[in-house]
UniProtKB/Swiss-Prot annotation:
It comes from Rattus norvegicus. It comes from the Eukaryota. Keywords: Cell membrane, Disulfide bond, Glycoprotein, Hydrolase, Membrane, Metal-binding, Metalloprotease, Protease, Signal-anchor, Transmembrane, Transmembrane helix, Zinc. Residues 1-60 are cytoplasmic. All isoforms are expressed in aortic endothelial cells. Isoform A is also expressed in liver; isoform B in smooth muscle cells and fibroblasts; isoform C in aortic endothelial cells, smooth muscle cells, fibroblasts, liver and lung, and isoform D in smooth muscle cells. Its cofactor is Zn(2+). The chain crosses the membrane at residues 61-81. The active site is at 600, 663 (proton donor). Pfam families: Peptidase_M13, Peptidase_M13_N. It catalyses: Hydrolysis of the 21-Trp-|-Val-22 bond in big endothelin to form endothelin 1. GO terms for molecular function: endopeptidase activity; identical protein binding; metalloendopeptidase activity; protein homodimerization activity; zinc ion binding. This is Endothelin-converting enzyme 1.
C-alpha cells in the first residue's frame, strides 16, 4: 500500500512562521524567542523575592516589556496564519473565465459531492445533453470526435496540390461515398453480382457452388469476414520480436454470446436481428418472406450454436492459460473440418505456408467443437451462414434502402433514434476507418502544433515518475519483483500524435501503393480496400513487428497500451480539449490527459499486462508471493465493481477488472504528478466563482471528462460487451478509493464517496 501525503493547507505548524518569502534572516523561531524572554528570570521563589525588591517604575517597565513581547508573538502568529492560509490569486483571463463557465454548466452544485460525485460533477451536463438523434450514447469523447470529423470533412473536400498520392486516394474514396446519385442508380446490383460470382446464395437464388472450403477461403481471404473463427497476424506474445499467425473464436452477428443464450432478456433484440436478416434478403432479391424467414431462422440458430461453444470474455483474462502454440499440421488434427493448408495459403498469398508453420491458438477446445459443429451441419446452411457474414459486412456500402434497414435494427439493438444524419458524417467515418493513415497527414498538419509532442512527452515523464514513486512504497510486492516492475516502467515506449512514416509522402505512398480507388464506385472501393488490407497483413507475417504500426489512426479520440511492444500510444485526436488545453490550469490538464496517460501506463501492470515483461514477452517474471498478493488486492476491486449496477443490471467486476485497475492507478499517478508539479512550480491561480481549490479542481476535471449519457439498450450492450465500467462508475469507483479525494472534499468517513474499506492495487 502506498504511503499517503498529509493534507495540504490543513492545520498549522507552530514551530516557525515565515514573513514573506523564505530566505536567510527571515525565519523567527518561537523556541528561541521564548528563551530570550526568560533571560534574567530566576526560579519562581527567587523571582518572588526579586519582584518585591523592585521599584514601582521597574515593575511598570517589566509589565510593559512583557506585554510588548506578547503582542509581538501575537502579531507574528497572525502573520504566519495569514501566510499559510492565504488564498491563491484568481485567474481572470478570457481562457479561465471560459473554462469556468463550461465547468459550472456541467455541474449540479445542489448535489453533495460526498454523496454522489458523478452527479455533482456532471448533473448539469446530463440535463443539457439528452442522447442526440442518430446516437445511442453521447459524451465528451463523442463531442470531440464530431469536432475532428468536421475538420476531416473540410480537408477531404478541399484538394491541395501538395497532397501525396495516398491522401488523394482517401479523397477519391470519400467522394465516391458522397456520390449518392450513383449509389442509388446501382441499388443492390454490386452485392448481387458479387454473390453470384461466389456461387450464389440459397436465400436469393439458385445455389450452384456446393464447396464449403472454396467459399470459406474466398469470403475470408478477399472480403475480410470471419465466419467460425478469426485469422490474423500479430506479434507472438512469447517471442515479441516475431509476428505469427493467430486463430481465435469469432463468427457471431450480435455483439456478445449473451444475446443468444439469455433469450428471454434479449427477445426484442433477437426478433429485431431476425427481421433485419429477412429485410436484407428481400432487398437482395430473395423473393417472398415465407421462403426467406425459415432459412434466416436457421442461420440464427446456427449462430446460437456457435454462441454456446464461445468462451465468455471474463474467462479469457489469463493469457498464460489461453496461449497455445501449435503447428499447421497439429491444427489440422485439432480441427479437421477445415483443410488448413489451402485455407492459410489463400489468406496469406504469396507467402508460402507449410505443415510446420507455427500458429498461436487462443482456445483449442473452441476450435475442436467448431470443427465438430461444421461436420454435423447441412452444407446449404453452412453456405447460407458464410454468405450472411459477407452480406452483413458489405450491405452498408449500398443504397438508402439498406441504410434504412441498418437504422431500424440499430434502433432495436442500441436504442438509436432514426434520423437523417448528414451523409458526410457516415462517409467521413468510413473513410477514416479504412484510410485513416492515408488522410492522417492532412489532419496532423491542421490540428497538431509542432511542440505538442514535446508537451505530451513532458506530461508522460511526470506521470511515469509519479507511478514509480508509488511503486516504491507498495507493501504487498517483494523487492525483486518491484525492481523488475520499475525496469518495465522505465522501458515503456511513448508514441505520440502519429506514426512517423505518414509525414513522409514517399513512405506513405509506398504503404498505399497497391490500393487504387475508383471515382464514383463506392462499393468497389470498399471491396478493394478489404482485399488490400489482407495483402498488407500477409506481408507482415515474415517481418518483425515495428513501432510505426499503430492500432489507431491519428484522428482517433482514444489511446492504448500494447503489451507486446510495451508502449503507450496517444493519437493526435485525443491531445485536445477537454483532455488538454494550453491555457487551462494544470489541475485540469493533469485531471484530463494526465489521467489518460496514467491509465494507459497502468495497463502495463493490470491483470493481463502484468504477465508481459519489459521486452513484451509473456512469461512468469513475478515471484509467487507477489502474484498471490496481487490477486488479493485485485479481488477487492472485483467485488467493489460487482456491487454497481445500471437499471438493475450488475456490472461484471471480473470482465472489467483490467480497465478498473487502470482507472484507479491512472488517477493516483496523475494526482501525485500534479502535486510534484506544484512543488516545483508553485501554486496555481484558482478559477473564479467556483470556490474550489486547485486540488479539488483536479478531481472535478477528471470526473467531467466522463460526463455521458446512454440509451437503456446501449447501457445493456455495454454491460455485457465493454471491458470498461460505465462512465458513472469509472468516476465513483476510482474516487471512492482515493484517500486524497476524501481529504480535499472533507467527506465524512463512511459516506458513499469515502467508504471505510477502500481498494488499492497500484
Amino acid at each position: 500500500m502506498g504511503s499517503l501525503r498529509p493534507p495540504q493547507g490543513l492545520g498549522l505548524q507552530w514551530s516557525s512562521f515565515f514573513l514573506g518569502k523564505k530566505g536567510p534572516g527571515l525565519t523567527v523561531s518561537l523556541p528561541l524567542l521564548a528563551s530570550s524572554l526568560q533571560v534574567n528570570f530566576r526560579s519562581p521563589r527567587s523571582g518572588q523575592r526579586c519582584w518585591a525588591a523592585r521599584t514601582s517604575v521597574e515593575k511598570r517597565l517589566v509589565v510593559l516589556v512583557t506585554l510588548l513581547a506578547a503582542g509581538l508573538v501575537a502579531c507574528l502568529a497572525a502573520l504566519g496564519i495569514q501566510y499559510r492560509t492565504r488564498t491563491p490569486p484568481v485567474c481572470l483571463t478570457e481562457a479561465c473565465v471560459s473554462v469556468t463557465s463550461s465547468i459550472l454548466n456541467s455541474m449540479d452544485p445542489t448535489v453533495d459531492p460526498c454523496q454522489d460525485f458523478f452527479s455533482y460533477a456532471c448533473g448539469g451536463w446530463i440535463k443539457a445533453n439528452p442522447v442526440p438523434d442518430g446516437h445511442s450514447r453521447w459524451g465528451t469523447f463523442s463531442n470531440l470526435w464530431e469536432h475532428n470529423q468536421a475538420i476531416i470533412k473540410h480537408l477531404l473536400e478541399n484538394s491541395t496540390a501538395s497532397a501525396s498520392e495516398a491522401e488523394k486516394k482517401a479523397q477519391v474514396y470519400y467522394r465516391a461515398c458522397m456520390n449518392e446519385t450513383r449509389i442509388e442508380e446501382l441499388r443492390a446490383k454490386p452485392l448481387m453480382e458479387l454473390i453470384e460470382k461466389l456461387g450464389g446464395w440459397n436465400i436469393t437464388g439458385p445455389w450452384a457452388k456446393d464447396n464449403f472450403q472454396d467459399t470459406l477461403q474466398v469470403v475470408t481471404a478477399h472480403y475480410r469476414t470471419s465466419p467460425f473463427f478469426s485469422v490474423y497476424v500479430s506479434a507472438d506474445s512469447k517471442n515479441s520480436n516475431s509476428n505469427v499467425i493467430q486463430v481465435d473464436q469469432s463468427g457471431l452477428g450480435l455483439p456478445s454470446r449473451d444475446y443468444y443464450l439469455n433469450k428471454t432478456e434479449n427477445e426484442k433484440v433477437l426478433t429485431g436481428y431476425l427481421n433485419y436478416m429477412v429485410q436484407l434478403g428481400k432487398l437482395l432479391g430473395g423473393g417472398d418472406e415465407d421462403s426467406i424467414r425459415p432459412q434466416m431462422q436457421q442461420i440464427l440458430d446456427f449462430e446460437t450454436a456457435l454462441a454456446n461453444i464461445t468462451i465468455p470474455q471474463e474467462k479469457r483474462r489469463d493469457e498464460e492459460l489461453i496461449y497455445h502454440k501449435v503447428t499447421a499440421a497439429e491444427l489440422q488434427t485439432l480441427a479437421p473440418a477445415i483443410n488448413w493448408l489451402p485455407f492459410l495459403n489463400a489468406i496469406f498469398y504469396p507467402v508460402e505456408i507449410n505443415e510446420s508453420e507455427p500458429i498461436v491458438v487462443y482456445d483449442k477446445e473452441y476450435l475442436r467443437q467448431v470443427s465438430t459443429l461444421i461436420n454435423s451441419t447441412d452444407k446449404c446452411l453452412l453456405n447460407n451462414y458464410m454468405m450472411w457474414n459477407l452480406v452483413r459486412k458489405t450491405s452498408s456500402f449500398l443504397d438508402q434502402r439498406f441504410q434504412d434497414a441498418d437504422e431500424k435494427f440499430m434502433e432495436v439493438m442500441y436504442g438509436t433514434k432514426k434520423t437523417c444524419l448528414p451523409r458526410w458524417k457516415f462517409c467521413v467515418s468510413d473513410t477514416e476507418n479504412n484510410l485513416g493513415f492515408a488522410l492522417g497527414p492532412m489532419f496532423v498538419k491542421a490540428t497538431f502544433a509542432e511542440d505538442s509532442k514535446n508537451i505530451a512527452s513532458e506530461i508522460i515523464l511526470e506521470i511515469k515518475k509519479a507511478f514509480e514513486e508509488s511503486l516504491s512504497t507498495l507493501k504487498w510486492m517483494d523487492e525483486d519483483t518491484r525492481r523488475s516492475a520499475k525496469e518495465k516502467a522505465d522501458a515503456i515506449y511513448n508514441m505520440i500524435g502519429y506514426p512517423n512514416f505518414i509525414m513522409d509522402p514517399k513512405e506513405l505512398d509506398k504503404v498505399f501503393n497497391d490500393y487504387t480507388a475508383v471515382p464514383d464506385l463506392y462499393f468497389e472501393n470498399a471491396m478493394r480496400f478489404f482485399n488490400f488490407s489482407l495483402r498488407v497483413t500477409a506481408d507482415q507475417l515474415r517481418k518483425a513487428p515495428n513501432r510505426d504500426q499503430w492500432s489507431m489512426t491519428p484522428p482517433m479520440v482514444n489511446a492504448y497500451y500494447s503489451p507486446t511492444k510495451n508502449e503507450i500510444v496517444f493519437p493526435a485526436g485525443i491531445l485536445q480539449a477537454p483532455f488538454y488545453t494550453r491555457s487551462s490550469p494544470n489541475a485540469l490538464n493533469f485531471g484530463g490527459i494526465g489521467v489518460v496517460v496514467g491509465h494507459e501506463l497502468t495497463h502495463a501492470f493490470d491483470d493481463q499486462g502484468r504477465e508481459y515483461d519489459k521486452d513484451g514477452n509473456l512469461r512468469p517474471w513475478w515471484k509467487n508471493s507477489s502474484v498471490e498478493a496481487f490477486k488479493q488486492q485485485t479481488e477487492c476491486m472485483v467485488q467493489q465493481y460487482n456491487n454497481y449496477s445500471v437499471n438493475g443490471e450488475p456490472v461484471n467486476g471480473r470482465h472489467t477488472l483490467g480497465e478498473n485497475i487502470a482507472d484507479n492507478g491512472g488517477l493516483k499517478a496523475a494526482y501525485r504528478a500534479y502535486q510534484n508539479w506544484v512543488k516545483k512550480n508553485g501554486a496555481e491561480q484558482i478559477l473564479p466563482t467556483l470556490g474550489l481549490t486547485s486540488n479539488q479542481l483536479f478531481f472535478l476535471g477528471f470526473a467531467q471528462v466522463w460526463c455521458s449519457v446512454r440509451t437503456p439498450e446501449s447501457s445493456h450492450e455495454g454491460l455485457i460487451t465493454d471491458p470498461h465500467s460505465p462512465s458513472r462508475f469509472r468516476v465513483i469507483g476510482s474516487l471512492s478509493n482515493s484517500k486524497e479525494f476524501s481529504e480535499h472534499f472533507r467527506c465524512p468517513l463512511g459516506s458513499p464517496m469515502n467508504p471505510r474499506h477502500k481498494c488499492e492495487v497500484w
